[in-house]
């Protein structure tokens, strides 16, 4: 049986559509909002991140930051992926040095190189920055930029972490991936600002973190332009350092490549202090955070007494500076993706 409501069919369809829309709205409101940081325990660190995002993205509020000015910076080693027992780039350098020495045994005549080849890390560390620079110069120079990128990519595809026996690109921190995803969704430009080699990190930043290579700022080795006999050209890597993007070098790198102070900055060591200072001493809503490695069971526990990723002054300065210290043990429900 059909009843005549007296309403035109178009009006009836509009009323029906309105009723459906209202029902859908009520259903959506009844469902809890999806947690953008599901790998984080509810605590001060998680709330600080969410609060900063909320304050800076709400229009017509005092702390609103226009999308074009929203910048987030992340250190890499120890902030986005594992840095113990040695920085990944240094493990790469040692593996490459051993491979090179097999072809050219004369490399082992240089004491610091012999120590690295023999796995004598105590002697390598005793060589200080000069010794490390020599190892990096030998293993990272004497080739084109493209060739170096290929070598790094190939190594990352086969190398395994000595403790976890997983590729290094799988030992990234799931909670930090979630933060990066949230910030991108809220209109932040996400940058990696690392003390590691800029080209080394660029070789994997896009597939690993979703960070394009032109959003990576790092320590830079010298290069020169070369025009080849076949008419092609290349950037050739030289055995010298042009810029060190660590400590006070990080704000310099940010100014040179980004051109804006970060709204939010993440680090994990004393080498990130100046980056956090650069971010949080500027007007407006800002946030600086340290990842504190205090979980020996799931990852590593270290801070003041380590040569790799030392966090000493940073812990001392954090309370007065208003920086948030993220406890890996207490704030993170999981460490790595997939487990």
What function would you assign to each model-found segment?
Residues 70-84, 276:
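Asp-based phosphoryl-transfer active-site loop
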Residues 32-36, 50, 54, 69, ...:
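C-terminal cap/substrate-recognition subdomain and adjoining C-terminal extension
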Residues 1-10, 14, 18-25:
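N-terminal secretory signal peptides
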Residues 58-59, 81-83, 225-226:
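Short, solvent-exposed loop/turn elements at domain surfaces
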